[in-house]
Regions:
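Acidic, metal-coordinating catalytic segment for phosphate/diphosphate chemistry
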Residues: 1-38
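Short connector loops at helix/strand junctions that flank enzyme active sites
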Residues: 16, 31-35, 41-43, 55-57, ...
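Conserved hydrophobic/aromatic beta-strand scaffold that supports enzyme active sites
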Residues: 18-20, 39, 48, 109-111, ...
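Surface loops and adjacent helix of pleckstrin homology
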Residues: 33, 51, 141
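Conserved Nudix-box catalytic region and its N-terminal flanking loop in Nudix hydrolases
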Residues: 41-83
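Unchanged
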Residues: 67-152, 156, 160-162, 175-176, ...
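Extracellular, disulfide-bonded carbohydrate-recognition/adhesion ectodomains
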Residues: 166-168, 172-173
Length: 196
């Protein structure tokens, strides 16, 4: 039995540095994670959830989380809504696709139509509320992507066709280092809220 250890190097026939097993040359590809979620609405109001987990515990968000194996992006978005805000929604068209290379995530955010105003906190949520767009406390939102999704939802209100948005112009993407450890992907501070 050999000890498993990896080192970062460029594998043969590749162009990027990757973790490679020092014994068998197995390449451990580091790929972005897919996050799925929905801007859920009922009668012109949007559903927000107060996070009860880190990062950004106590801040407001839309229902979203990591996609699971064996589900479509739409199924994942519906599951996240059920888990976080105890609500069944009709998942509509794709609202936005945000690529955030600094934290290795691709966010697929859908429109979610609520059949009623019923909602409740799930296991990762301490509070839920339906709010009008002009009542959103923008300083209390957990992540820049939540702000983008809510604004894109407002801007595309009434348009049901496939019209996905992307990361807003002017957002600075910080590249990952080519060598060494990956940066801390913890919560964003107020000073780097629009730097992703």
């Amino acid at each position: 039995m050999h000890e498993i250890s990896f080192s970062r190097r460029v594998p043969p026939d590749d162009t990027h540095e990757r973790p490679v097993c020092n014994h068998c040359e197995y390449v451990a590809y580091e790929n972005p994670k897919i996050v799925v979620g929905a801007v859920c609405s009922f009668e012109g109001r949007v559903l927000l959830a107060r996070r009860d987990i880190e990062p950004r515990r106590g801040f407001w968000t839309i229902p979203a989380g990591f996609m699971e194996l064996g589900e479509t992006t739409q199924q994942g978005a519906a599951r996240e809504v059920r888990e976080e805000v105890c609500c069944e929604v009709e998942i509509g068209s794709l609202l936005a696709c945000y690529s955030i290379p600094r934290i290795g995530q691709v966010l697929m955010i859908y429109r979610g139509q609520m059949p009623s105003a019923q909602h409740a906190p799930g296991d990762e949520t301490s509070e839920t509320k339906l709010v009008a767009f002009d009542e959103i406390d923008w300083d209390e939102l957990a992540f820049p992507s939540v702000r983008w999704a809510l604004r894109d939802w407002r801007d595309l209100s009434g348009e049901d066709d496939f019209a996905p948005r992307s990361v807003p112009d002017g957002v600075v993407h910080q590249p990952l280092p080519k060598t060494g450890p990956l940066p801390n992907t913890g919560p964003l501070s107020a000073s780097d809220a629009e730097v992703v």
